[in-house]
Amino acid sequence: MRLSKLKLAGFKTFVDPTTVLTPGNLVGVVGPNGCGKSNIIDAVRWVLGETRASALRGESMQDVIFNGSTTRKPVSRASVELVFDNAEGRAAGQWSRYAEISVKRVLDRSGESTYYINNVHVRRKDVIDLFLGTGLGPRAYAIIEQGMISRIIEARPEEIRGFLEEAAGVTKYRERRKETEGRLRDARDNLARLDDIRMELGERIVHLEAQAAVAARYRELDAAHVEKQQLLWLVKRNEARAEQARVAASLNEASSRIEADSARLQELETSVESRRDAHFEASEAVHVAQNDLFAASAEVARLETELQHLGEARRRLEARLAQLELDRGHWSSRRETLAADRARWQELAENAALRAEHAEARHLEIADRLPELDSSRQGADATMAAARRELAQTEQQLRVEETKRASALRALEALQQRRGRLEGERGGIVGPDERVLAEREARLEALQDELEVHQQELAAAQPRLPDAQAALKAALEHERAVQRRLTELRARRDALMQLQARVQSQGKLGDWLERHGLDQLPPLWKQLQVAAGWDEAVQAVLRERLAALTSPDPALALAAARTVLDETPPESLAIALPARSGAPAERANCAQGPLSPQGRVTVATTATESSTAIATDVAPAVLALAGLVEVRDPALRALVDDFLAGAWAVERLEDWLPLRAQLAPSTCLVGPRGQVLTRDALVHHAPDARTHGVIERQREIEGLSAELQAHEDEAHLAHDALVVAESAASALQERINGLRRELQTIQAQVHAEQVEVLKLAQARARAQERREQLARDLEDIVHLESAEREHLTRAELEQARAAELAELQRERLDAATEVLREREHAVREARALEQSAARELQEARFSERECAGKLEDIARNQQLAGEQLERVVAELAARAAELDATDDHRSAEALQEALALRGRREAALAARRDALAEAAAALKQVEELRLRTEHEAAPIRARVAELRLALQAAELAVAQFEERLVEARADEAALAPLLAAEPKESTLQREVARLAREIAELGAVNMAALDELTTASERKGYLDAQTEDLLQAIDTLEDAIRRIDRETREQLQDTYNTVNRQFGALFPQLFGGGRAELVLTGEEILDAGIQIVAQPPGKKNASIHLLSGGEKALTAIALVFSMFQLNPAPFCMLDEVDAPLDDTNTERYANMVKRMSAQTQFIFISHSKITMEFAQQLVGVTMQEQGVSRVVEVDIEEALRLADPAAA
């Protein structure tokens, strides 16, 4: 591939559509500074995919769009198009079959770029892939912009390796390896996550296996623990009852002894109080005397401390005086030493000044001779330069004419070849079949109509779905509420029935009844239905008869009674024996009322009558208790009436207390709370623990059963409503889902048809556009061939004239060069002498400044020594005066007086302490007597307190263990055989503790461990299979990376060797000698950087950074051209690469470019006349209108004349 033209529109300063033709292999771009030449380089870099605004000399990517000028408005978009000649089919992939390839990029103000290849919209990656490995790209070595040569030569080793990789064409391997590494990294991350999950899951499986074993052990231990704990509570309860009786007897005996001791202690308390007052007065007198002694002792201590401080101050002053004497001697000696140093350095300073004077005179003498020698050398240099310029101009003109001739020949040949290719391509263009396109469009229209129908159906169905879902949700909530209520009612009913069943089992009695076949006889309370509020009244009258076994058959009841008489039951038992006759008479008697004939009342025999019964003036109304009880079995009605005969129900027993004497014998009144009033007593019967509440619970069970039946009917209805709502919502949801699936299918078909129609339409447009483009290109080729033939004829005539003039100018140049060499030698010798004198003068002046600095330091030190000596003498006098002022005689006299006062106060304190001792002895005697009495009574009080605590503890223990047994639902009958063995409490305690310890040692027990273990094992098997798949994928990816690395290493190593060899050959050609090479910074070429070693002729520099700017530029050019020879890019762009080069090196550079142009097309920007001479074609860039660049035709001769200021 080679670049045939470059099209710009709206890009930076190229606001108008501009076409730059590049038919030759050496195309120069010329023009004044700031006219926009470098924008051509930026345009090529931009269209190849550059995304960094800084690389395009802008702050943002929108800066490449023309932003207006003084006469132009900003434009909305920028576009750049590269057109390549692909006659040899070197393009990559599907584009190799095109004779021409155009690459285009468009950017608008929104900041969005679009890329096209042959007018087909592509991705940026597709553009980069097209040139991958060719040396072209946004950051490849084939586009050398301003300053890039210096950046290449100063690049890091890793960056230079990147250039080598591009030259080797391994960047595509790098991309493949990067993608493979990404997939490998993802696979390893997934494997690491799987390993973590599998490890965690494995640990959990081990844990679950242990938990499953623990759960079985837990059930076994828990059953044994419950049994032993209940047995222990039963033993402790029995022992607590025995302890309670024993402690109560001991407490009564100890209480009587306490009362006698309390009277005697009262008398002794009175005597103790009088003795305590006398002791307090003596103690106050001792306190006063002791305070006086403390004050005297404090004064003595203060005076002793003061004398000690005076002695220490005197010793410190004497030590300071000795130190000051030493300091005075030191500073005196220091001042004498500094005076001797000052004299020595003064003499050295005078000698240094004399040497500086002599050196300065010699330097001035040599410097006066240099201008004359330098002027002579400059004259010879000017003569040689003039001769060289004349020869260079002539040779340049000769090369230009040769270049013009060769360029014209190549251009003609290229135009003929291009015309043939374009004509062939025009004949081979085939557009799409119009019939197929019409069929596709018709099918697309039909699919769109079908799509609209389905969308309407879906739009109609979707609004109905929320209503159906809401109805389903309401039905579901109602059904759940009904089920919750059913569950609550069943739980309540079942709990009550269990309580009734436990009451009916009757502990030990149940076994006895079962053994004698009496367990099927129902208790009496099951046959009764009591009016609300009178349960406790009926229980108070019936008491144990409430649990009496009943039978409607009198014979069966008598048989049960005979069984009881034959074998005594283990607990209380009643057998109801219904009478065969006489029941009506008893009910008639009940209707006579509870009072004797003197005080009759109105009696109601039923609950209904009770509400209307009116009391007489004598007593309130009453109701026969039997009238409040309904009997389910009519055969037992008489029996119940017999049991309740003589019992009357009253609302308020308080009203009957004054009338109790009038009650008839064997008659009683019963209140709602179960209190019973007879003629002689008011009795409150505590509820029987076994039968208490059975009537109320039975009534509640019957109510719950009725309510439960009603809710079950409601639950059936709610379930039917839920099924209907679920069916409606499910059908509607399924219909919507089906419509959505059909809609997605049709949309996919519509999209596919749209794509196909668009492809056919675009193909038709591209074919037509390409035919028109080829016609325009062929017309341009005809005009270009005519112009190139005229250029060929003119170049051949000018070439002959320039050859004769060049030979004469070479002879004049050789003579001028010899004269210049002699005069340069004389100038170098004079400069060496001047430098020697300057160094001598510099050393003398440095020595002079050093001596002056030393003298200043000595003067400062002398001043400091004098100041220090004066300070020491002054402080010495002050300390001597302070020592004379120190006196301690007055403090010694005051101390003696204080000691005498302290002696007197010690004697007074001793007398008062004796009086206090006598009072204390009297108080002690009385208190000892009281304490002895209290001590004698204390054991008795303690005994009483202990007994009271023991009694409370026993009562609490009984209640506690009773409560525990009830809460644990312990079956005492089942525990009786174990209790008969008289187990010891300590043994049971150890067993319970052992079992509890073993249960606690098990820790938290997961009873669902088995299910969790099965689930975890299945999941681990699935994860193990996934891990195997990932390991195989990782092995495959690692093999691919190793294969890529191997191929890359081999290709990169070959490239390195070839480029290094070519670099070593090109470097001496550009420098006229020297050596250069590339050196790896590591052993592995894939990771190692590359350093450049370059040594021009006569230099042994250790680093390329020591080279001049021109030498660095030539070195970088040699390196880039070495890469070109290995992997020639389709074209190379050079932006003022020759700027830092002198004429000689510019000529070498131009010759090198010319030789390289046989394989690579070069497009260069230059201001150098020498470089322009080598161009086969010149493209001029001007900016006649401010801010707007244009391309113009350039006459090579006129360009050379404008580039040479001397020719103007």
From Swiss-Prot:
Key words of the record: ATP-binding, Coiled coil, Cytoplasm, DNA-binding, Nucleotide-binding
Lineage top rank: taxon: Bacteria
Q: Which SUPFAM superfamilies match?
A: P-loop containing nucleoside triphosphate hydrolases
GO terms under biological process: chromosome condensation; chromosome segregation; DNA replication; sister chromatid cohesion
Question: What GO MF annotations does this protein's record show?
Answer: ATP binding; ATP hydrolysis activity; DNA binding
Q: Where does ATP bind?
A: 32-39
UniProt keyword annotation of ATP-binding present: yes
Q: Where in the cell is it found?
A: Cytoplasm
The cellular component terms of Gene Ontology attached to this UniProt record, alphabetical and capped at eight, are: cytoplasm
* Coiled-coil segments on the chain, per record: 170-205, 239-504, 694-1054
- What does the record note on quaternary structure? Homodimer.
UniProt remark on domains: Contains large globular domains required for ATP hydrolysis at each terminus and a third globular domain forming a flexible hinge near the middle of the molecule. These domains are separated by coiled-coil structures.
- Family classification: Belongs to the SMC family.
This molecule's function is given as: Required for chromosome condensation and partitioning.
Q: What name is this protein filed under?
A: Chromosome partition protein Smc
Taxonomic placement: Bacteria, Pseudomonadati, Pseudomonadota, Betaproteobacteria, Rhodocyclales
